């Protein structure tokens, strides 16, 4: 976001008025510029490098190309644009203590900033709905939300985000009418984001608060359903272990099927926790800024300018966090290690250890040529299927992975979660 439209002085730089000697002041300014320049450069590098790594991993490894990870790619693209087109110019604005790119780029830069934040929160909202459908309608999930439908949803998210960010700013609907704001709009070297009260409140609600409320509500429902599933799995396993040993010996597949059912759902719930961390981190990083964004137009000079800028940069830093959070996933972690040449090709299992059948499902062959003998398979069998109906213990609370919809299509829940 641009700098706030209030009358505070720029306080992130050292204050020269108290310096006893001009040379000392210049040295202090130079040291501050160098230190902040290095810090901001590291932030930009972390954002760009991390999100390029995420996008490359999903593009290269077919096992990661799931519906949910399509949305993760959209989120990474928003963070990447933030790191390439927003944060560097914000850093220059701070370090040079003035805007040097002209009025047009000032408004365009601000529009891109709003676009990235809006696209991120709306994508997180879509991910919450995606997981809600996967948890509550496992029979129909892949028929309800195919990869082509996911692409359409992503396109709609970016179109809506573009309209809500570029249109009001490029049409100047955001502009305030007081003298200081008018003078800033006319100066090529001023890029403080002076806004009128209706725009500040409406844009914050549409771009952040409304999607946030939807995301929190839907995801709370997802966790409630997931918690009930885990409780039913525990009860189911208890009943299974209480069965006669001879019955298990007569049908050895029942034990394998029960273990695979539990393992699949436990892995899915771990993925839900990872997505919850992503959403929680985004909220913690951006919520303070959007609170201040409304407060400062209601009560001018209540929020100091340096506080506004620091909270804005806290939001920027969030773009570097997501790739670190994805490392919770064994699939992503191994993909990152292979892309960085930190391990030998263990993801050969994506192609060599798996074979596709006529229903476009992936079957684990039992051999993963990418793993060396004795190496721990920390990917948790990257090609492992969800529990099949043939192995399924039909008890309350357990859900088979396959179903046939009304048109006769096979709807499998074989979707790698992060």
Swiss-Prot record:
Induction context: 50% increase with progesterone treatment in cultured oviduct epithelial cells.
Extracellular side of membrane: 1-34, 96-106, 175-196, 299-305
Keyword field: Cell membrane, Disulfide bond, Endosome, G-protein coupled receptor, Glycoprotein, Golgi apparatus, Hydroxylation, Lipoprotein, Membrane, Palmitate, Phosphoprotein, Receptor, Transducer, Transmembrane, Transmembrane helix, Ubl conjugation
One GO cellular component term noted in the UniProt record for this chain: mitotic spindle
Residues bearing glycans: 6, 15, 23
Matches recorded under Pfam families: 7tm_1
GO molecular function, one term: protein homodimerization activity
Modified residues annotated as 4-hydroxyproline in this record: 387, 400
Major location category of this protein: membrane
Complexes and interactors: Binds NHERF1 and GPRASP1. Interacts with ARRB1 and ARRB2. Interacts with SRC. Interacts with USP20 and USP33. Interacts with VHL; the interaction, which is increased on hydroxylation of ADRB2, ubiquitinates ADRB2 leading to its degradation. Interacts with EGLN3; the interaction hydroxylates ADRB2 facilitating VHL-E3 ligase-mediated ubiquitination. Interacts (via PDZ-binding motif) with SNX27 (via PDZ domain); the interaction is required when endocytosed to prevent degradation in lysosomes and promote recycling to the plasma membrane. Interacts with CNIH4. Interacts with ARRDC3.
PANTHER family assigned: ADRENERGIC RECEPTOR-RELATED G-PROTEIN COUPLED RECEPTOR, BETA-2 ADRENERGIC RECEPTOR
Protein name per Swiss-Prot or TrEMBL: Beta-2 adrenergic receptor
